[in-house]
């Protein structure tokens, strides 16, 4: 599925139904600014034309992205978790539960980059968001949530 179809068929309907009235900013892979040879538009151009504010992530290095996620996972705010994942984010939860992983070579060594699979795409996007929002890193804490909300413990069966 291309970017335009994804935006129109998936992203816009999701935002309209679940997040109506909220603003949205897209943080994308820095490679998304590269223009296609077919029509000279980039993925970023397509998002902008569809009305989105989009910025490239500060870096796409895996070490910085994983460090940003780790920073959120190991931080607490007012005694509670700083990093919350909505139970509806099943793809992200499944990535966290082992879908996002490093491939083991036949020699027993582990690859230096995560395996590219259906879980890696959602986790890559999540890493870019964490990197952008990381107050200790590149992002300056742009997504720090104000106020508190009720958090319920959930059990997941997949």
Where is each model-derived feature located?
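Mg2+-dependent endonuclease catalytic cores in nucleic-acid-processing enzymes, primarily RNase H-like
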Residues: 1-117, 136-137, 149, 155-158
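Acidic, Mg2+-coordinating catalytic module of metal-dependent nucleases/exonucleases
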Residues: 116-140
